[in-house]
Design a protein with these regions (language model features):
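C-terminal all-alpha effector/ligand-binding and dimerization domain
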Residues: 1-114
Protein backbone atom coordinates (compact mmCIF):
# COMPACT_ATOMS: atom_id res chain seq x y z
CA UNK A 1 0.00 0.00 0.00
CA UNK A 2 1.41 3.39 -0.95
CA UNK A 3 0.09 6.68 0.42
CA UNK A 4 1.35 9.89 -1.19
CA UNK A 5 0.71 13.17 0.60
CA UNK A 6 1.69 16.79 0.09
CA UNK A 7 2.11 18.48 3.46
CA UNK A 8 1.09 22.14 3.61
CA UNK A 9 2.03 24.76 6.23
CA UNK A 10 0.49 28.23 6.25
CA UNK A 11 -0.76 27.61 2.71
CA UNK A 12 2.69 26.67 1.37
CA UNK A 13 3.72 23.18 0.21
CA UNK A 14 6.50 21.95 2.48
CA UNK A 15 6.90 18.16 2.26
CA UNK A 16 6.17 15.43 -0.26
CA UNK A 17 5.64 12.15 1.61
CA UNK A 18 5.46 8.64 0.21
CA UNK A 19 4.54 6.12 2.90
CA UNK A 20 4.47 2.38 2.23
CA UNK A 21 2.66 -0.28 4.25
CA UNK A 22 2.17 -4.00 3.71
CA UNK A 23 -1.28 -5.30 2.67
CA UNK A 24 -1.93 -6.00 6.37
CA UNK A 25 -2.76 -2.30 6.66
CA UNK A 26 -5.34 -2.16 3.85
CA UNK A 27 -7.87 -0.84 6.40
CA UNK A 28 -6.15 2.56 5.98
CA UNK A 29 -8.02 3.03 2.69
CA UNK A 30 -11.21 3.43 4.73
CA UNK A 31 -9.72 6.17 6.92
CA UNK A 32 -9.40 9.94 6.57
CA UNK A 33 -5.72 10.24 5.64
CA UNK A 34 -5.52 14.02 5.94
CA UNK A 35 -4.61 13.81 9.63
CA UNK A 36 -2.03 11.83 11.57
CA UNK A 37 -1.32 8.32 10.32
CA UNK A 38 0.08 7.47 13.75
CA UNK A 39 -3.22 8.41 15.42
CA UNK A 40 -5.12 6.19 12.97
CA UNK A 41 -2.72 3.31 13.62
CA UNK A 42 -2.90 3.78 17.42
CA UNK A 43 -6.72 3.83 17.23
CA UNK A 44 -6.43 0.42 15.54
CA UNK A 45 -4.07 -0.95 18.21
CA UNK A 46 -0.84 -0.49 16.26
CA UNK A 47 1.82 1.32 18.26
CA UNK A 48 5.16 2.53 16.93
CA UNK A 49 8.00 1.76 19.30
CA UNK A 50 11.05 2.85 17.34
CA UNK A 51 12.73 2.99 14.01
CA UNK A 52 15.51 4.40 11.94
CA UNK A 53 15.74 7.79 10.23
CA UNK A 54 18.23 8.70 7.51
CA UNK A 55 18.62 12.34 6.45
CA UNK A 56 20.37 13.37 3.26
CA UNK A 57 19.94 15.85 0.42
CA UNK A 58 18.49 15.46 -3.07
CA UNK A 59 17.61 17.57 -6.11
CA UNK A 60 13.99 18.01 -7.14
CA UNK A 61 12.61 16.39 -10.24
CA UNK A 62 10.30 18.43 -12.45
CA UNK A 63 7.22 16.90 -10.80
CA UNK A 64 8.54 17.45 -7.25
CA UNK A 65 9.49 21.04 -8.06
CA UNK A 66 5.97 21.74 -9.31
CA UNK A 67 4.41 20.27 -6.17
CA UNK A 68 6.75 22.19 -3.84
CA UNK A 69 6.57 25.38 -5.94
CA UNK A 70 10.35 25.59 -6.39
CA UNK A 71 12.74 25.37 -9.33
CA UNK A 72 13.60 22.01 -10.86
CA UNK A 73 16.92 20.61 -9.58
CA UNK A 74 16.71 22.66 -6.37
CA UNK A 75 18.41 21.10 -3.34
CA UNK A 76 15.99 19.63 -0.78
CA UNK A 77 16.27 17.57 2.36
CA UNK A 78 15.62 13.86 1.81
CA UNK A 79 14.46 11.85 4.79
CA UNK A 80 13.76 8.12 4.94
CA UNK A 81 12.08 6.53 7.96
CA UNK A 82 11.48 2.90 8.83
CA UNK A 83 9.12 2.50 11.80
CA UNK A 84 8.74 -0.70 13.81
CA UNK A 85 6.50 -2.11 16.53
CA UNK A 86 7.60 -3.42 19.95
CA UNK A 87 8.73 -6.71 18.36
CA UNK A 88 10.92 -4.90 15.82
CA UNK A 89 8.52 -5.76 13.01
CA UNK A 90 8.43 -3.04 10.34
CA UNK A 91 5.14 -1.15 10.21
CA UNK A 92 5.94 1.25 7.40
CA UNK A 93 8.62 3.08 5.49
CA UNK A 94 8.36 6.73 4.51
CA UNK A 95 10.35 8.84 2.07
CA UNK A 96 10.04 12.61 2.43
CA UNK A 97 11.31 15.40 0.22
CA UNK A 98 11.41 18.53 2.35
CA UNK A 99 11.83 22.18 1.42
CA UNK A 100 14.51 23.36 3.90
CA UNK A 101 13.41 26.98 3.52
CA UNK A 102 10.08 26.10 5.11
CA UNK A 103 11.05 23.33 7.52
CA UNK A 104 13.31 22.94 10.52
CA UNK A 105 14.67 19.71 11.98
CA UNK A 106 15.48 19.73 15.69
CA UNK A 107 17.31 16.74 17.14
CA UNK A 108 17.36 16.30 20.92
CA UNK A 109 20.29 14.30 22.22
CA UNK A 110 20.82 12.52 25.52
CA UNK A 111 24.11 11.80 27.27
CA UNK A 112 25.50 8.30 26.95
CA UNK A 113 24.81 6.50 30.23
CA UNK A 114 27.08 3.55 29.48
Amino acid sequence: IRINRLRISDGDPVVIEETRFSQKYAFLFGENLEGSLYEILAHNGIIMSGGKRTINICNTTKEEAELLEVEENEVMLYMKDICVDANGTPIHSCKSIINPRRYEIIINTMPNKG
